Amino acid sequence: MTDKLPLALFLMGPTASGKTELAIRLRQKFPVEIISVDSALIYKGMDIGTAKPDERELSLAPHRLIDILDPSESYSAADFRRDALQAMDDIVAEGKIPLLVGGTMLYYKALLEGLSPLPAANPEIRQQIEQEALTKGWSVLHDELKEIDPVSAARIHPNDPQRLSRALEVYRISGKTLTELTQTKGESLPYRVKQFAIAPKDRAELHRRIELRFDKMMEAGFEEEMKALYARKDLHPDLPSIRCVGYRQMWEYLDGECTRDEAVFRGVCATRQLAKRQITWLRSWDDLTWLDSDNIEQALETMSEAIASD
């Protein structure tokens, strides 16, 4: 049965590992179309701090699912799965192969395994939770979550109001915890998937790449990009867009919480931590072929052979 399913390629990896370069090279050799799997690239006007592919790169290899939302909006794993499946179907209908590229592991997981049947958001209950947070504080609500769902509470930081609110909301709507509901998996992906991950073999090299990229972003005008977002007045640090690595730290600088140099240092550290989490997740991933960032030619050959032999 799986032999009749269309082929899809996953190219995963930590930030600054060379995914975009490899994807563009691959598109120049094969009939693949790129779908971005990145929770930061979805936002318009957030180009420099997300290291979004530039005009030249996009002309060589257009990316779907970038620049689809305003930074004031939210986007869930369910939203991604819906949009990605539609994009994949469109690509296959054109006789091409979907190539999904990015580092948002939760999106890949949602796409592969489907989503558990969580209740839809309830604005009334959400408003009630936010009002409680104003009067009691999020730390008290986090303690409440510890009582009803210790597993989720261990994963959700007290300073993450979006996820904390959602966990409490799910329980109040359904009477079941987020942990209980997420153990029920949804519909699996109707594709034959070949999965690849690219990263430097040496962690110090990845750290060097991250620091270099952050410096280049600052030189390219990241501070000015951030100031434009800050000046809008309708954005705030609890939004998913502003919680993106780099943006949160630059917001703190513009808010007067730290100096510019401290913001850059914090941004680099936060990016390293993100990369570490991405690699940890990938190491537990099944059916994954690892590629070396320091040998793009070999990585290209490995992926090319996998496509040609299909």
Swiss-Prot record:
GO terms for molecular function: ATP binding; tRNA dimethylallyltransferase activity. ATP binds at G13, P14, T15, A16, S17, G18, K19, T20. It catalyses: adenosine(37) in tRNA + dimethylallyl diphosphate = N(6)-dimethylallyladenosine(37) in tRNA + diphosphate. HAMAP family: IPP_trans. Catalyzes the transfer of a dimethylallyl group onto the adenine at position 37 in tRNAs that read codons beginning with uridine, leading to the formation of N6-(dimethylallyl)adenosine (i(6)A). Belongs to the IPP transferase family. This is tRNA dimethylallyltransferase. The lineage of its organism: Bacteria, Pseudomonadati, Pseudomonadota, Gammaproteobacteria, Vibrionales. The gene is miaA.
